[in-house]
A protein has these predicted regions:
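Sec-dependent N-terminal signal peptides
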Residues: 20-47
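Outer-membrane beta-barrel pore domains
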Residues: 97-104, 144-145, 159-160, 204-207, ...
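Intrinsically disordered and other compositionally biased segments
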Residues: 11-16, 25, 35, 51, ...
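Sensor of tandemly repeated, compositionally biased sequence architecture
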Residues: 9, 21-22, 29, 77-85
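Outer membrane beta-barrel
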Residues: 117-148, 158-340, 428-470, 477-490
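N-terminal secretory signal peptides that target proteins for export/translocation
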Residues: 1-22
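Short, aromatic- and cysteine-enriched interfacial helices/patches
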Residues: 13-17, 47, 60-63, 120, ...
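N-terminal periplasmic/intermembrane-space "pro-region" immediately following the signal or transit peptide
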Residues: 2, 38-153, 202-205, 444-466, ...
Length: 560
């Protein structure tokens, strides 16, 4: 019997694929086409956003991708519609899909990707989910300054000098997931934001950077009696609201001076240790505490020469309305630690950086390397929001006990201080910032009662210029910040910084933004009157490097 029309072509294709000689370009082309269709949001059979099949099957594959961009698959809830089923809704209307599952992560980066349930037991407690994501931040910065900061390095000028640059600020790849309803894990590496250097100024290996280094690398167990969620591994310790907020959602290109001087000065804010987090059932009161290694490099998890560090944070949310669109948050945090190798260096870069940390970024204030027996820190947080307006402020204080000056490093880059080896007692440094933001397009920020920080902003209309889509221009956010750092205390004076940063953020989608910053910093700084020589420290003139520094920056940032 003769084949119906078209059957001969289908059989030819079947023979092509069954013969083992199918061309590689065909598979590659189909993969590229599928990826392109998913990226632009076109409905693809079996992918979120397509109409349900006539005979729904248990999903095995991608259940959701970038947060806010693609809807999750609808789980099959009924058999295939029969001829007696009611007709589908008219036009393009479809019944609402269920909300994506709640997923606890370090920065709400992406929604889960399901690889399948346990095929043997069918038990939800053994369901495994995995997420794959990353982020890229590309910066362009330019600077200008008055005479003082532009003096030579050995005459109290900025060290290193200012330099314009186009560079990657961060480039990370991340894989995290959950096993059952109690265990979750994360691993993330940054390929652009690390320099292999010691606290003592000089690099361990010259010209070694940027280097890939771990940020998140931890395992967490939830629902532990009394302790709540217990996390073990490389992580952020619970100290500081700005510190615990994801770099994906920062209001400015850089965090405050205090983040650089106190919170995460040389380890990028990630330290190895164990922590526990718990709170009331409604989330309005929460606490977190942990024990960590006091590292001085992003590679410190493999170096046991450091001291111990205990950190804790308590948060109270007296006002929480409309998912945090009206909010008042009050927090208090503390650290107590043994200085690594008995040495501490307080320093801060500016409100704009010209790429990854290390020898390319100018140091605005610097105490030099001090010795000490113990260090305590205190932090206070105040966060509020009302509709499109929000604000946050923090204060930090640091006490270094039994401090003394040292001759470690090039003394010419340190601030004014007595001769090396001079005991100076307790050194107290402090700083803080206050910032405010306003959505010009009317959006409001929501707040996570689980992690006690703002969620990722969601534009009302993502950027869409295609005539086949609903026209949208994203969200626009204006921001302003006052920034303060004082590294002056009695005998050891590393400098005083007062800064103002203005920002304009264009949120193209929930996962992509363009950031514009102008930073103005006034620096009060005098160099130390000592220099190293073969015979020991010798007196030299002290220079005045005070002045004003202007910075202009822009960033293209996206994560997936």
């Amino acid at each position: 019997m003769e084949d119906p029309a078209g059957n001969s072509k289908r059989r030819s294709l079947h023979r092509l694929f069954a013969s083992g000689t199918r061309p590689r370009w065909l598979a590659a082309g189909l993969t590229a086409l599928l990826a392109a269709l998913v990226a632009i949001g076109c409905p693809v059979s079996g992918i979120a956003g397509s109409p349900p099949a006539a005979e729904p099957r248990r999903p095995f594959g991608i259940a959701g991708v970038a947060e806010g961009m693609v809807e999750p698959l609808s789980p099959p809830s009924s058999p295939a519609p029969s001829s007696q089923s009611p007709p589908p809704p008219a036009g393009d209307e479809r019944p609402p899909l269920p909300s994506p599952p709640i997923w606890e992560g370090n920065g709400d980066e992406i929604a889960p990707v399901r690889f399948g349930d346990d095929p043997l037991h069918g038990d939800e407690s053994t369901t495994a989910t995995v997420r794959i994501g990353g982020l890229v931040q590309l910066d362009d910065t330019a600077y200008a300054a008055s005479a003082g900061p532009m003096q030579p390095i050995d005459q109290a000028g900025l060290a290193p000098p200012l330099s314009d640059a186009v560079n990657f600020r961060r480039a990370r790849l991340r894989v995290d997931g959950r096993r059952g309803d109690q265990f979750d894990w994360a691993t993330e590496y940054d390929f652009a934001n690390q320099i292999n250097a010691k606290n003592q100024i000089d690099p361990l290996f010259p010209s070694q950077g940027p280097l890939p280094a771990v940020t998140d690398l931890w395992l967490r167990m939830s629902d532990v009696p009394l302790l709540g969620a217990v996390r073990v591994g490389n992580q952020k310790d619970p100290f500081g609201y700005e510190h615990l907020s994801s770099c994906r959602t920062l209001d400015f290109m850089e965090r405050s001076f205090c983040q650089d001087a106190f919170v995460g000065p040389f380890n990028d804010g990630f330290v190895p240790g164990i922590s526990a987090r718990n709170g009331t059932a409604d989330g309005l009161l929460g606490w977190e505490a942990g024990e960590f290694a006091n590292t001085a490099a992003p590679f410190g998890f493999s170096d046991f020469a450091g001291g111990s560090m205990t950190s804790g944070r308590v948060v109270w949310v007296p006002t929480y309305e409309d998912d945090g669109r009206r909010l008042l948050h009050i927090g208090l945090a503390g650290r107590t630690m043994q200085p690594r190798n008995g040495l501490v260096r307080f320093r801060s870069r500016g409100g704009l950086w010209n790429g990854p940390p290390g020898p390319d970024n100018a140091i605005y204030a610097d105490s030099g390397v001090l010795s000490g027996s113990w260090q305590n820190m205190l932090g206070a947080e105040l966060v509020a929001s009302a509709g499109p307006w929000s604000m946050q402020a923090e204060y930090f204080g640091s006490w270094l006990y039994d401090a003394a000056t040292t001759d470690i490093g090039p003394l010419s880059t340190a601030g004014w201080q007595p001769p090396p080896g001079t005991p100076v007692g307790t050194v107290f440094y402090q700083g803080g910032y206050v910032e405010t933001t306003y959505f010009l397009t009317g959006e409001s920020r929501t707040y996570s009662l689980l992690e006690h920080r703002f969620d990722r902003p969601q534009p009302r209309h993502i950027l869409a210029l295609s005539p086949h889509r609903t026209r949208g221009f994203g969200a626009w956010q204006a921001a302003a910040r006052y920034n303060y750092l004082c590294l002056n205390d009695t005998q050891v004076n590393g400098g005083l910084l007062n800064g103002m940063t203005l920002g304009l953020n264009w949120l193209l989608t929930p996962n992509a933004r363009i950031v514009f910053n102008y930073d103005l910093t006034h620096r009060e700084y005098r160099s130390t009157p000592w220099a190293n020589s073969p015979s020991g420290p010798v007196p030299v003139p002290s220079y005045n490097g005070s002045g004003t520094i202007h910075g202009f920056g822009s960033r293209l940032a996206f994560d997936f």
